[in-house]
Amino acid sequence: MNPIKHMAIIMDGNGRWGLKHKNSRNLGHKEGLKTVEMVMKYCIEKKIKFLTLYAFSTENWKRPLKERNYLFRLLEIYLIEKLEKLNNEKIKIKIFGEKKFSEKLNSLLDFAEKKTTRNTKLQINLALNYGSKKE
């Protein structure tokens, strides 16, 4: 049995990576999502039960509106396209933070949590609009 039960990642630096390698912050965020998928696969292979992704902090509201909208749309598209696959792989989605997003994104987040609530292979703790100062 793997002694590691929980992995946590602060998703920071994707925009800077994107500027350096792709000349686009948005492409960096998109590549970061591919990395998340690789990490999820790794966690399942190694039987790590919990993966926390600190994805959007309360401080991230200071980013330009266009970038924030891109991040939220990226998450919406991911949930629409991948939720069934995540559910079939027995991955549970748990959201932490205040859901102060668009009605569409809030609905998708709620739906993802409800749809995957009984899954036990891997729990993804998604920290969105979350800040340690508020805790």
Question: Positions of the model-derived regions?
Answer:
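Flexible, compositionally biased loop and terminal segments
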Residues: M1-E135
